UniProtKB/Swiss-Prot annotation:
It is a single-pass membrane protein. Coiled coil: none annotated. GO terms for cellular component: chloroplast thylakoid membrane; photosystem II. Belongs to the Psb30/Ycf12 family. This is Photosystem II reaction center protein Psb30. A core subunit of photosystem II (PSII), probably helps stabilize the reaction center. PSII is composed of 1 copy each of membrane proteins PsbA, PsbB, PsbC, PsbD, PsbE, PsbF, PsbH, PsbI, PsbJ, PsbK, PsbL, PsbM, PsbT, PsbX, PsbY, PsbZ, Psb30/Ycf12, peripheral proteins of the oxygen-evolving complex and a large number of cofactors. It forms dimeric complexes. Signal peptide: none annotated. InterPro entries: PSII_Ycf12_core-subunit. Keywords: Chloroplast, Membrane, Photosynthesis, Photosystem II, Plastid, Thylakoid, Transmembrane, Transmembrane helix. Pfam families: PSII_Ycf12 (PF05969). The chain crosses the membrane at residues 6-26. One of its GO terms (biological process) is photosynthesis.
Amino acid sequence: MINWQVIGQLIATGAIMLAGPAVIVLLALKKGNL
């Protein structure tokens, strides 16, 4: 059986780890352009 709850948590954790730096970079670029 596949444990979807664990898979969901791993995907969510990975998404947060990727989204964090991406948001920081986007904010830095927007501040740099202003």
